[in-house]
Regions:
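Conserved phosphate-interacting/catalytic interface
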Residues: 53
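Polytopic alpha-helical membrane-helix bundles and their juxtamembrane interface segments
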Residues: 1-47, 56-209
Length: 209
């Protein structure tokens, strides 16, 4: 079976592999100073990984059949995982700012978003808006914490800026003939996830052995 949207699908699969490896590496780290907070970062890496896998399959093999059951299931997986990834980032920001009301605010957006996805909605604009909410919260938290002298947040800030740059590429529709905006976004997002991994390691800490 030929790949339909090769640039998008292959870069989605690349992002899937990168985030899966990062999640597994983080899961295996021992002697963490904050072991109870590891789950929220694992949630980020594994949900991005799963949504990328679903996206690669959808774009690569079912983009010509958007009304098919398989395509709808794949998009449901993407939507739900984007929601959980946004939750994970907002959770870290809220805990850092000691303001868990941010999670309540997020839930106001997430509940109708999940209901929309479960009812078969597949307008990616809603998905992008949810992701943007998490990025904005995380961006301002990163700037605030870094300016306070928390150097671990430099990696978080760079990861957030990379992801926002990727979003701009998609919105402005910057791309090449055989390598479109979505493919470029996936590559930039992969770089952003590497920065998030660096941040996660510093945030969780590790006792010397």
């Amino acid at each position: 079976m030929p790949i339909l949207e090769a640039d998008i699908a292959l870069t989605d699969f690349f992002l899937f592999a990168i985030t899966l490896i990062l999640g597994l590496k983080l899961q295996k780290r021992k002697n963490l100073r904050k072991p109870r907070e590891r789950w929220v970062f694992l949630l980020l890496f594994y949900t991005v990984s799963l949504s990328s896998l679903a996206g690669g399959i959808a774009h690569g093999f079912y983009s010509n059949a958007p009304e098919s059951t398989i395509f709808r299931i794949l998009w449901l997986i993407i939507f739900v995982n984007v929601g959980f990834a946004t939750y994970s980032m907002t959770h870290v920001a809220a805990k850092s700012l000691n303001n868990m009301k941010l999670l309540w605010l997020l839930s106001v957006f997430l509940m109708p978003f999940f209901i929309y996805a479960l009812l078969g909605g597949n307008n990616f604009l809603y998905c992008a808006l949810i992701a943007l909410f998490g990025q904005i919260i995380f961006l301002f938290t990163s700037i605030y914490e870094f300016r306070r002298g928390n150097l671990a947040w430099k990696a978080a800030l760079l990861g957030c800026l990379a992801t926002c740059l990727g979003m701009i590429v998609q919105v402005v529709h910057i791309g090449f003939e055989n390598f479109g905006p979505s493919a470029i976004f996936h590559m930039i997002q992969a770089a952003g996830m590497l920065y998030y991994f660096s941040f996660a390691k510093q945030y969780l800490g590790q006792y010397s052995t």
